Amino acid sequence: MSQVLTTYETPVLPEWVDYNGHLRDAFYLLVFSYATDALMAHIGLDSQNRDASGHSLFTLECHLNFLHEVKEGARVEVRTQLLGHDRKRLHIHHALYLPGSGQALALSEQMLLHVSLDGPRSAPFEGEVLARVEALAEAHRALPVPEGVGRVIGLPPVR
């Protein structure tokens, strides 16, 4: 499976649109958040497993890039790639597209932390979840790193 995952699809709802007639910035994050939920289910951290294991993922950092306008009613999909992982963290990349399109509309690079909810405190991946993370990492290993990953926001220093 050397391809990104399609993790979420939705139409752009009227209540998500701002006064400029396009998707409000906060709702890009909502769509990407739902895609993260689907990724969690894919690796075995769905609601049933979260309740049984007492483990979940928390978002540590999120970078959003808005590339093209998205209008009300447009059907969009999120494609997700696991860029890397360690014992407790996932580094992921979400990209928003029109289905069947090769042009990204928005990007979200995120760092997620695996946690034990009884603290909450960080916790290493274990068992089936670890096996699924490792399988996904292996499947995505040959994929190219998306453009803009690791980008830093800022202006040149004033001299």
UniProtKB/Swiss-Prot annotation:
UniProt keyword ATP-binding, yes or no: no
Induction comment from the UniProt entry of this chain: Highly induced by carnitine via the CdhR transcriptional regulator. Not induced by glycine betaine or pyruvate.
An MF annotation (GO) of this entry: fatty acyl-CoA hydrolase activity
Phenotype reported upon loss of the gene: Cells are incapable of growth on carnitine.
EC number: 3.1.2.33
Catalytic activity: N,N,N-trimethylglycyl-CoA + H2O = glycine betaine + CoA + H(+)
Coiled-coil region(s): none
GO biological-process terms attached to the record: carnitine catabolic process
UniProt pathway: Amine and polyamine metabolism; carnitine metabolism
Xref: Gene3D superfamilies: Hotdog Thioesterase
Keywords: Hydrolase
Record flagged with keyword Hydrolase: yes
Enzyme superclass (EC): hydrolase
Transmembrane segment boundaries: none
Sequence similarity: Belongs to the betainyl-CoA thioesterase family.
UniProt cross-references to PANTHER family, sorted A to Z: 4-HYDROXYBENZOYL-COA THIOESTERASE FAMILY MEMBER, BLR1345 PROTEIN
UniProt function note: Catalyzes the cleavage of betainyl-CoA (N,N,N-trimethylglycyl-CoA) into glycine betaine and coenzyme A. Is involved in a L-carnitine degradation pathway that allows P.aeruginosa to grow on L-carnitine as the sole source of carbon and nitrogen.
Name by which UniProt lists this protein: Betainyl-CoA thioesterase
Organism: Pseudomonas aeruginosa (strain ATCC 15692 / DSM 22644 / CIP 104116 / JCM 14847 / LMG 12228 / 1C / PRS 101 / PAO1)
